[in-house]
Regions:
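Acidic, low-complexity Ser/Thr/Gly/Pro-rich repeat segments typical of extracellular/periplasmic
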Residues: 3-241
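Short amphipathic beta-strand/extended segments with alternating polar/hydrophobic composition
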Residues: 90, 191, 262-271, 382-384
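Extracytoplasmic/secreted envelope proteins and their assembly/folding machinery
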Residues: 67, 111, 127, 159, ...
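Gly/Pro-biased beta-strand-loop elements
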Residues: 226-338
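Exported/periplasmic cell-wall-interacting domains
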Residues: 154, 241, 283-286, 301-437
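Structured segments of extracytoplasmic/periplasmic soluble domains
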Residues: 161, 165, 169, 297-298, ...
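Short, charged beta-turn/beta-strand-edge "cap" motif at the junction between a beta-strand
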Residues: 116-117, 218-220, 260, 297, ...
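A short, structured loop/turn motif at beta-sheet edges
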Residues: 119-120, 133-135, 207-208, 261, ...
């Protein structure tokens, strides 16, 4: 018995002496049989990170998209920073990719810091640097209509004027950088009214009581040779009650609707029609006008006619609401009360009763649609804010990026807007019009 026990122990000693190091990981043993050994598991590789632009890159175009990818793991942190500011970006599916959403500042050094983790949680950290090229000119917004915080009508456009002309090849990029948000998403499009002015209009009127936010992500946006956007800005305004005015100059009556219900019916008198020897057209324009401002009073002067010549006048007219750039207003009739509701007697404006004109001046927002019918003269789309004169297909033809859907605003989306240039709301006194009365 003693010899047998020694032999078993010796056998075990022979196994150990053979230098086999994986006995501890062996599977379960059965009676009379030693456990089978298993090889040790290999360590999980670390995630591999790739960054574009490459480390040390210089003269990077400001509209370059920074792209980060991770293979064999997930991205858990990405920052593209310059000083205290960081570029906005978004992760791709599965957090294996990340890219900047908007442009970069010109002539700026950026540091990219990336952390990725493999399936075991082990981290890979990558830090790279690059520098963007300098701009010879900086594209900026010089004015925006309506004013920040203003309450406007359902037809109100957003009019953005730039300090430089924008090249046709870069207009789509500029449009995409002008992000419009609203409580209820609507379809709309930007339209280039000139080389330096772009206008946003919904396909249909804005819903009443809507908040609207414009965010101009202009940083790093190209505008032409050597022209790059240098900074962002945002501002908001509100759509008020729905005001819709229908003026029929065949019957000489105007109907005013508020939130879909008829609020008032007012007798009016439009342009008398015809032309004078000075080339003045005395027809009121038909079409979809927008109210452009309200005034206590406006001095109205006959265009192209000097004092002492037939047809000259220069008179102060009260309770004025401007509806075009060719001198058309809705206002209190300065006389000829018998014409209201019966005959067109004015030089092109829409005359109203004293109480009706005062009520409308105090009720109207900028951007209220005023639809005038019954005359042979048609409002041009570029006469004031005649943008609704363009069909939707014609409006899209003036866009480089095509239709967009406004971004739905969260309840907290409208914080304090950044300071930006806006056009002032109209106030008395108004500029002297070219066609009046």
């Amino acid at each position: 018995m003693r010899n047998g026990r020694w032999l078993v122990a010796g056998a075990a000693g022979l196994v150990l002496a053979a230098g086999i190091t994986y006995v501890a990981t062996a599977g379960p043993a059965t009676a009379g049989h030693p456990a089978a050994p298993r090889p040790a598991s290999k360590p999980t590789p670390l995630a591999v990170v790739a960054v574009t632009p490459a480390d040390g890159a210089a003269m990077v175009a400001p509209d370059t998209q920074v792209q980060v990818t991770a293979s064999g793991g997930m991205l858990t942190q990405v920052t593209v920073a310059s000083g205290d500011s960081a570029a906005t970006g978004q992760y791709g599916p599965g957090s294996t990719s990340w890219s900047t959403r908007w442009g970069l500042k010109p002539a700026t050094s950026y540091t990219v810091t990336v952390v990725a983790r493999n399936s075991k949680g082990a981290a890979t950290t990558e830090v790279t640097h690059f520098t963007t090229k300098r701009a010879s000119r900086i594209l900026q917004v010089s004015s925006i209509t309506p004013s920040s915080g203003e309450t406007v009508g359902v037809g109100m456009p957003i009019i953005v004027d730039f300090n430089y002309d924008v090249a046709r090849s870069d207009r789509a990029a500029v449009e995409r950088a002008l992000e419009v948000g609203s409580d209820v998403p609507v379809t709309g499009a930007w339209f280039w009214a000139s080389d330096s002015e772009v206008v946003f209009r919904p396909q249909s009127y804005w819903p009443a009581h809507e908040r609207v936010l414009l965010t101009a992500h202009l940083t790093g946006v190209p505008g032409g040779p050597g022209l790059w956007g240098g900074s962002d800005l945002s501002y908001s305004f509100k759509i008020g009650d729905s005001h819709l005015v229908k003026v029929n100059l065949k019957t000489d009556w105007a109907r005013f609707y508020i939130n879909g219900s008829l609020a008032r019916t007012i007798p009016v008198s439009g342009g008398m029609g015809g032309y004078d020897s000075f080339g003045n057209d005395f027809y009121t324009t038909s079409g979809v006008h927008l109210t452009m401002g309200s005034y206590d009073s406006v001095w109205m002067t006959s265009p192209n006619i000097k004092p002492g010549q037939p047809g000259y006048y220069h008179e102060l007219v009260y309770d004025d609401v401007q509806i075009s750039d060719s001198g058309e207003y809705m206002h209190q009739s300065p006389g000829g009360w018998w014409c209201l509701g019966h005959e067109n007697c004015s030089h092109g404006c829409v005359r109203m009763t004293a109480d009706g004109a005062a009520w409308w001046r105090h009720t109207a927002y900028r951007g209220d649609p005023v639809i005038i019918t019954g005359t042979p003269r048609v409002l041009a789309w570029d006469n004031g804010w005649g943008y609704w004169q363009e069909s939707w297909s014609a409006w899209l033809a003036g866009s480089s990026a095509g239709p967009v859907t406004t971004t739905a605003l969260a309840e907290a989306s409208l914080g304090a807007p950044s300071a930006g240039p806006t056009s002032p709301a109209a106030s008395s006194p108004a500029p002297i019009p070219t066609t009046v009365g």
